[in-house]
A protein has these predicted regions:
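Glycosyltransferase donor-sugar binding loop
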Residues: 42, 176, 206, 233-246, ...
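Short His-centered aromatic/hydrophobic patch
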Residues: 91-96, 115
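Membrane-proximal helix-turn-helix segments that form the acceptor-binding/catalytic region
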Residues: 132-149
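Carbohydrate-associated surface elements
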Residues: 156, 175
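Conserved donor-binding/catalytic core segment of Leloir-type glycosyltransferases
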Residues: 197-213, 219-222, 235
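Nucleotide-activated donor-binding/catalytic signature segment of Leloir-type glycosyltransferases, i.e.
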Residues: 246-263
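Short alpha-helical donor nucleotide-sugar binding micro-motif in glycosyltransferases
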Residues: 270-275
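Aromatic "clamp/platform" in nucleotide-sugar-dependent glycosyltransferases that forms part
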Residues: 283
Length: 316
């Protein structure tokens, strides 16, 4: 079978992208012909083809381009033409849905929407971000008008999709790469690298530094923890996708908070192994892949009892 998988980016730091890469490799192992189409990519794929369509380099321009991607009809048309002859197109996130939408409309290629969800707009910090997320959700809904079937990554997302679009979907939980994320990994070298002493406890958060991840609340909670347990450090690993929000987080932090914008994907399991507890204050997660990965590494997880967390957090 010839399968196309669409994702806006293919980077190691993105949970959705790791899901896409694992999915592509699994299909390829079953001897399907797999091509991943992305606007931007860093990793070099093994076992499947990659077609990078391109987008602006500036973070601000990227956000605008992705929101208004439907205006770049030439790129959508050219990408959809490449999908002729494919048996199925799986679109993982807006704005790639527009390519699948057009391929379905023009060439009758089967269109499967993989629902990772979109964070609630009210969780964002200013009026421009709220408006952006409202428009993002609106355009996403339009791009789903002709889907053949949908997959949701949790029961929470299944309910949200039904409520927002009336689309029925099948629940398929994200898979963890159990060869990489497992118990028994030695995180000693990472602790030494970070300067964590034997008598100190290390808390870990992994994820994009976005307002809906509620990292500012995590920092406030950590301050309270630090008052009672002064030998505690908090490591935050994530790309600052909202520069002003990142500045706010840095200003809220003291010497006991360590920020790392980038961690080599091969090293990520060792960071989970190095921590004593995985923590998140996120108020919206379609699945929360880092929490699942931390649990696979044998770590307890502390999270709010909201969104998909009751389904995902089993060792908290």
């Amino acid at each position: 079978m010839k399968i196309a998988i669409l994702t806006p980016t293919l980077h190691y730091f993105s949970g959705i992208d790791r899901v896409v890469e694992l999915q592509a490799k699994e299909y390829a192992k079953k001897h399907h012909q797999v091509t991943v189409f992305a606007l931007e990519s860093t990793p070099r794929p093994k076992g499947f083809k990659l077609d990078v369509l391109g987008m602006p380099k500036s973070l601000l321009l990227q956000r605008l381009y992705r929101l208004l991607f439907f205006l770049d009809f030439k790129k959508i048309k050219n990408a959809a033409e490449k999908l002729q002859g494919y048996d199925v197109v799986i679109s993982h996130f807006y704005p790639m849905n527009w390519i699948a939408y057009y391929a379905k409309k023009k060439y009758n290629v089967k269109y499967v929407y993989y629902n990772h969800g979109i964070g609630y707009n009210y969780l964002f910090s200013n009026i421009f971000e709220v408006l952006y997320m409202k428009l993002f959700a609106f355009f996403n809904k339009l791009s789903l008008k002709n889907v053949d079937s949908a997959v949701s990554i949790s029961k929470f997302m299944q309910k949200e999709l039904k409520k927002e679009t009336r689309l029925e979907s099948k629940v398929v939980y994200n898979k963890i790469d159990k060869k990489r994320f497992k118990k028994g990994i030695d995180g000693t070298k990472i602790r030494k690298k970070l300067g964590i002493k034997n008598n100190e406890k290390l808390l870990l958060f992994v994820g994009r530094l976005s307002p809906h991840k509620n990292v500012h609340t995590l920092l406030r909670i950590f301050d309270l923890v630090n008052e009672k347990l002064p030998n505690t450090k908090l490591l935050i690993i994530g790309k600052p996708t909202f520069p002003n929000y990142y500045k706010k987080l840095k200003n809220m932090s003291d010497k006991n908070v360590i920020f790392k914008e980038f961690v080599n994907d091969k090293e990520l399991p060792y960071y989970y192994a190095a921590c004593d507890l995985y923590v998140t204050a996120s108020l919206w997660e379609g699945f929360n892949l880092p929490a699942a990965e931390a649990q696979a590494c044998g770590k307890r997880v502390v999270a709010f009892d909201v969104c998909s967390h009751p389904e995902i957090v089993k060792n908290g």
